[in-house]
Design a protein with these regions (language model features):
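Predominantly extracellular beta-rich ligand-binding scaffolds that present long acidic/polar faces
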Residues: 3-13, 57-73, 77-208, 227, ...
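Right-handed parallel beta-helix/beta-spiral solenoid domain characteristic of secreted/periplasmic
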Residues: 11-53, 75, 193-202, 300-324
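Residue-level detector of conserved, well-ordered beta-strand and adjacent loop positions
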Residues: 15, 25, 97, 105, ...
Length: 324
């Protein structure tokens, strides 16, 4: 859909069929979408938005909700964000990547950002601004901010007085990478990580995560993914489709991308089998060399190799090989 969508003063809900295939293309002639009030925009890719104002892809204000979106390949020359959030907006379950600008600008916003991946943008991942005079006080939870080309994945802008609450999120560089100014407040909560999220293939735009990723089951313990397990961080949850009680690992024929651990869809490493298994389950490991350090996580598990001579767990001289 090559158009620029403006909700005007209406509170509307617009939902696409599939976020991968239902595309709003701004045709490099303005914002992809602008909405306010109680409006909802959900399940689209928004691309090729452009302009010098805030939110070249999406500008949301009021109590608007942005849900299940892919926002990519948008450009802005003033650093006012591919997405601009104002007032009490919500951004969730969305991927914001490969934009020629800051990923998300919070402008005088008490916004909530949850289960969002913000990566590979040319500016900061998130920037707090007060272009209209009001400071920003967003909450970031269950999200990933990683690999943005500006050194600041989260950035405070003058004048001071902004605040952000971050919990159960992966922030590249961690707390020490975020510079605050006088009267700014950084609330660094529980459960945050500073590690590689192990994206599948960013060169080809695949921001799903490897089953070895530390973001799996690392979201807030009271939040869940659609499979009923503890929430992951980011826009692409790993959804459990197999429940054992026998798990399968094969270094040669298995995979750590999209695998379930079943006999026909084995993992390539032992660690994810331990992660998803329940106490009392068994893990059958095919012949091969597995370079990993294993922790049974307090579970009662049965780990069985194909043969002692050909099934090898190699700790790579980096710590205890097996903790059980």
């Amino acid at each position: 859909y090559r158009e620029n969508i403006d909700y005007g003063s209406k509170s509307l809900t617009i939902i696409g069929e599939n976020r991968e295939t239902t595309i709003i293309d701004g045709n490099n002639s303005g914002r992809g979408a602008e909405l306010a009030g109680q409006s909802i925009l959900s399940t689209f890719t928004i691309q090729n938005g452009s302009g010098n104002n805030g939110g070249n892809a999406v500008h949301a204000s009021g109590n608007a909700i942005l849900d299940n979106l892919i926002i990519t390949s948008n450009s802005n020359t003033l650093g006012n964000g591919s997405v601009m959030l104002e007032a009490n907006t919500v951004l969730k379950n969305s991927l914001i990547v490969n934009n020629q600008d800051v990923g998300v600008v919070c402008n005088g916003a008490d916004a909530t950002i949850s289960n969002v991946t913000i990566a590979s943008n040319t500016g900061a991942g998130i920037e707090l601004k007060s272009l209209g005079g009001s400071n920003s006080h967003p909450t970031l939870i269950n999200s990933i901010v990683y690999g943005n080309q500006d050194n600041n994945n989260i950035q405070f802008s003058a004048p001071s007085g902004h605040s952000i609450n971050i919990s159960y999120s992966l922030i590249q560089g961690g707390q020490d990478s975020i510079t605050t100014y006088t009267n700014d407040t950084l609330s660094w909560g529980t459960g945050n990580l500073d590690v590689d999220p192990l994206f599948a293939d960013t060169a080809n735009g695949d921001y799903r995560v490897n089953v070895l990723s530390p973001v799996i089951n690392a979201g807030h313990p009271d939040s869940t993914d659609s499979d009923g397990t503890r929430a992951d961080m980011g826009a692409y949850p790993y959804l459990k489709t197999y429940n054992g009680p026998v798990w399968f690992v094969d270094a040669v024929n298995g995979s750590n991308f999209g695998s379930s651990g079943s006999s026909v869809n084995a993992f390539a490493a032992i660690t994810p089998a331990i992660k998803f298994a329940s106490s009392g389950d068994s893990i059958n490991v095919a012949a091969g060399t597995y370079v990993e350090n294993l922790d049974f996580e307090g579970k009662n598990l049965k780990l069985v190799g194909a043969d002692a001579a050909t099934t090898i767990i190699d700790g790579d001289s980096s710590g205890t090989v097996i903790r059980m």
